[in-house]
Swiss-Prot record:
Species annotation: Arabidopsis thaliana
GO cellular component: endoplasmic reticulum membrane
Membrane topology of this protein: Multi-pass membrane protein
Gene transcribed to yield this protein: ALMT5
Coiled-coil boundaries: 373-435
Keywords for the protein's UniProt record, in alphabetical order: Coiled coil, Endoplasmic reticulum, Ion channel, Ion transport, Membrane, Transmembrane, Transmembrane helix, Transport
Subcellular location: Endoplasmic reticulum membrane
Keyword 4Fe-4S: no
Pfam family, one: ALMT
Main location: endoplasmic reticulum
Record family assignment: Belongs to the aromatic acid exporter (TC 2.A.85) family.
Descriptive protein name: Aluminum-activated malate transporter 5
C-alpha cells in the first residue's frame, strides 16, 4: 500500500518532465525551422539587394580591390622593408576613409591627412621638448597629451569646425600614438614618418580605386533627389484634391500617419519624402562640393547649393499639401453637396499646379531652361486660382452660418431703406413735389425691398433643404444634442471647405518661389536651351 501511495507523485513528476521536454523540443524545432528559413532566404535577399541597385555591388567590389592592393604593396619587402611593423596603418586608412561616394572619400581623406600632418608635426616638437626635460620627460608628455586632448575636443564643439570633426579625432589618435610609442622606442621621427607615409599610401589607393573604377557621385544623386521631389509633391497634390472632391474617408487613420512614420499611403508618402529629404540633401551637398567635374557637371564650382535651395522651395509648397491632407484626415468634414459646388475650380487648380511641378521636375532632370517666359509658366494656374477665388466670393454664403448671414442681410437692407428715407426727406426741402408722388415713391421702394428680401430668404430656404451633413438632432450616449451644437458643427464643416480652398490658393502663391529658384539655378549651372515645352501629365 505504501509503495502504491509513493508511486503517485513519481508518476506526476515523470508526466511533468515529459511535458517540459515536449515544450523544449517544440521550441527547439521552431528555432531550427526559423534558422533554416533565414539561411534559405538570405541568398535571395542578398541577390535582390545587388539587383535593385548595382552600385552597392560595385562599392563592395571596389572595397575588396582597395584592401587587396594595399596588402600587396605592403608585402613588397624592398621599398617598405623597415615599415612592415607600421603596415596596419595603411589598411586602417583604407577601411576608415573608403566611402560609398567619391566626395565622401575625398572629405575623409582630406580630414585624415590634415589631422595626421598637424598631429605628427606637433608631436615631434613636444617629443624634442620632453627629451630636453630629462627626468621630467614623462611628466611633460602626459601634460602635453592632456592639453592636446582638451584643446582638440573643445575646438571640435565650435559650430564652424563641424566639417573637420574627423580630422580632430585623427589628430588626437596620431598625437598620442606618436608620443607614447616613440617614447618606448626612443625613435619619434621614424614613427611619425612611417605613419604619415603609410596613411598617404592607403589614402592614395582609396582615391584611385574610388574615382576611376565605377565611380559613384553624390552630386548625381542630389540632382536626381531634387527632381524626384517635384514629382512626389505633384502626385500628392493631385491625390489630395481628387480625394477631397470624392469625399474619401478613412475608417481608421493609420497609426504611422498619426506619428509621422513611413507609410504606404500614396498621398502621405509623396509629400513626406520631400519633407524628410532635408538631412539627405545636406549630406549629399557636403560630399558633392568636394567632387571634381564629371558628366554633365563640367564646372569646378558647380552650384550644388542652388539645388538644395530649389528643393527647399518645393518643400515650402509641400507643407501646404500636408495641410490639405490634414483636411482629409479631419473629423469635421464639409458636406458632399458643398464640395460639388466648388469641384470644377478646385480640380482645375490642382491639375494646373501639378502640371507646373512636373514641368519643373523634368527641366531639372534634363538640365534644360524654360522656353516660355516666367510669367507664362504660371499663367494657367494663376487664372485657375483667380476663378476659384471668384467662385468663393460669389458662393460665400455657403461657407458661413446661414442664420447669421440672413440676419446681416436683413440689417443691411434695413439700413439701406433708412438711408433712402433720409434722402427722400432731404430732397423734399429742395424740390417741391406733390404728396402723391412722394407716397408712390416710398411705396415702390418698400415694395422692391420686400421683394429682394423674399427672394433672398427663398434662396436661403432652398439651401437649408439641401444641407444634410449635420442632422438637426442626434443622440450621443442617450443624450440629445441641442440645436445650437448642431449649428456649431455645421459652421465648422463649412469652414473646413474654406480652409482647403485657401490652402490650395496659398500653394499657387508659393509657386513663385520655385520659379525664382529655378531661374537662378539654370543660370548658374548653365542649363541648355529647351527643346520641348510639353510636360508629361
Amino acid at each position: 500500500m505504501g509503495g502504491k501511495m509513493g508511486s503517485v507523485p513519481e508518476q506526476n513528476t515523470e508526466k511533468l518532465l515529459w511535458q517540459s521536454s515536449d515544450v523544449a523540443d517544440s521550441r527547439d524545432s521552431k528555432f531550427r525551422c526559423c534558422s533554416w528559413r533565414a539561411l534559405y532566404e538570405a541568398p535571395a535577399k542578398l541577390y535582390a539587394l545587388g539587383h535593385s541597385d548595382r552600385r552597392k555591388l560595385y562599392f563592395s567590389i571596389k572595397m575588396g580591390i582597395a584592401l587587396a592592393l594595399c596588402s600587396f604593396v605592403i608585402f613588397l619587402k624592398e621599398p617598405l622593408q623597415d615599415a612592415s611593423k607600421f603596415a596596419v596603418w595603411a589598411i586602417l586608412t583604407v577601411v576608415l576613409i573608403f566611402e560609398y561616394y567619391v566626395g565622401a572619400t575625398l572629405v575623409k581623406g582630406f580630414n585624415r591627412a590634415l589631422g595626421t600632418m598637424l598631429a605628427g608635426g606637433l608631436a615631434l616638437g613636444v617629443a624634442q621638448l620632453s627629451v630636453l626635460a630629462g627626468e621630467f620627460e614623462e611628466v611633460i608628455i602626459v601634460i602635453c597629451i592632456f592639453l592636446a586632448g582638451f584643446g582638440a575636443s573643445y575646438l571640435k564643439l565650435y559650430a564652424s569646425m563641424k566639417p573637420y570633426e574627423y580630422a580632430f579625432r585623427v589628430f588626437k589618435l596620431t598625437y598620442c600614438i606618436v608620443l607614447v610609442s616613440g617614447n618606448n622606442s626612443r625613435d619619434f621621427l621614424s614613427t611619425a614618418y612611417y605613419r604619415i607615409l603609410l596613411i598617404g599610401l592607403g589614402a592614395t589607393i582609396c582615391l584611385l580605386v574610388n574615382v576611376f573604377l565605377f565611380p559613384i557621385w553624390a552630386g548625381e544623386d542630389l540632382h536626381k533627389l531634387v527632381a524626384k521631389n517635384f514629382k512626389n509633391v505633384a502626385n500628392s497634390l493631385e491625390g489630395c484634391v481628387n480625394g477631397y472632391l470624392q469625399c474619401v474617408e478613412y475608417e481608421r487613420i493609420p497609426s504611422k500617419i498619426l506619428t509621422y512614420q513611413a507609410s504606404d499611403d500614396p498621398l502621405y508618402s509623396g509629400y513626406r519624402s520631400a519633407v524628410q529629404s532635408t538631412s539627405q540633401e545636406d549630406s549629399l551637398l557636403d560630399f558633392a562640393i568636394w567632387e571634381p567635374p564629371h558628366g554633365p557637371y563640367k564646372t569646378f564650382n558647380h552650384p550644388w547649393k542652388n539645388y538644395v535651395k530649389l528643393s527647399g522651395a518645393v518643400r515650402h509648397c509641400a507643407f501646404t499639401v500636408m495641410a490639405m491632407h490634414g483636411c482629409i484626415l479631419s473629423e469635421i468634414q464639409a458636406s458632399p453637396e458643398k464640395r460639388h459646388v466648388f469641384s470644377n475650380e478646385l480640380r482645375r487648380v490642382g491639375n494646373e499646379g501639378a502640371k507646373v511641378l512636373r514641368l519643373f521636375g523634368e527641366k531639372v532632370e534634363k538640365m534644360e531652361k524654360l522656353s516660355l517666359s516666367l510669367g507664362e509658366i504660371l499663367k494657367d494656374v494663376q487664372r485657375a486660382a483667380e476663378a476659384l477665388q471668384m467662385k468663393i466670393d460669389s458662393k460665400s454664403y455657403l461657407l458661413v452660418n446661414s442664420e447669421s448671414w440672413a440676419a446681416i442681410k436683413e440689417q443691411a437692407e434695413a439700413e439701406e431703406a433708412r438711408e433712402n428715407d433720409q434722402e427722400a426727406k432731404d430732397d423734399e426741402t429742395k424740390v417741391i413735389k406733390s404728396l402723391s408722388q412722394i407716397w408712390d415713391t416710398n411705396n415702390n421702394n418698400n415694395h422692391q425691398s420686400n421683394d429682394q428680401s423674399q427672394h433672398w430668404m427663398s434662396t436661403e430656404s432652398m439651401m437649408l433643404k439641401n444641407r444634410e451633413m449635420w442632422p438637426s438632432m442626434s443622440f450621443i450616449d442617450g443624450t440629445v444634442v441641442n440645436e445650437i451644437e448642431c449649428k456649431v458643427y455645421e459652421s465648422a464643416s463649412s469652414l473646413s471647405l474654406a480652409t482647403f480652398a485657401s490652402l490650395l490658393i496659398e500653394f499657387v502663391a508659393r509657386l513663385q518661389n520655385i520659379v525664382n529658384a529655378f531661374e537662378e539655378l539654370s543660370t548658374k549651372a548653365g542649363f541648355k536651351d529647351a527643346v520641348d515645352q510639353i510636360p508629361k501629365v
